[in-house]
Amino acid sequence: QMHVRKKAVMALHKVHLKSPSSVSHLHGKFRQMLCDKDPSVMSAALCALHDLTVSDPTPQKNLVPSFVSILKQVVEHRLPKSYDYHRVPAPFIQIRLLKILAQLGAADPKAATEMYSVLSAVLKKGDNQSSIGNAIVYECVRTAASIYPSPVLLEHCAGVVSRFVKSSNNNLKYAGLDALSCIVNINPNYATEHQMAVVDCLTDPDESLRKKTLDLLYRMTKSNNVEVIVDKMMDFLRDATDHHLREETATRIGELAERYAPSTQWFINTM
């Protein structure tokens, strides 16, 4: 029975991907299967509902309480142990739910407010330094940065991803810079206390990491930290050998100096 229901949902989903209008009258079935007692059926329904939400979030808005409730149950380890991966509860279901919530909470204070508590719980539980736990934290930060913002939640996110930035693992470091970039898009202030950890990434031998760091520092800069950041960029410029990277860095230093110069003398010295 369970396998039949799961395969039926997956088949409908495949038809939807090829010809959405053919199964538009059956969208209610995906919603119905979201409440199935078997997690594998529910998970299959989530995949379909994710695609529907990406296409048009509005019809799925009233499912926010259901998605939040399912995520809460997963985080609280209420799904069977067979769904654990490296002792993390149903990580792929968590990530799918986070992607759905990111769509539904965008520019919607009411929907987002319902999500804040469970997202905070996901951050706390996912921050266990395992690879899959890090993936969940990364996705959770992207979700928190996509929905109507909560200052408390975003501060929590910035604190968690600063550990990524300080990691010796370059993949994790890059993910941390990317996640911090999402937060900075909302308000650069959330990343200010972590700016020195970001600056340290400028000395990394990985070129893509250095480029990502320069981009983030550029967007983090304000009148109260322009001197520190531009000074570090100048140090980087002196040692850089890549022509294009030197050119890009020089351009950005000029833009920041023009925009935030604390004094005429500083501007002249910098330029």
For the regions a language model picked out, list residue spans one by one.
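Extended alpha-solenoid helical-repeat scaffolds
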Residues: 1-271
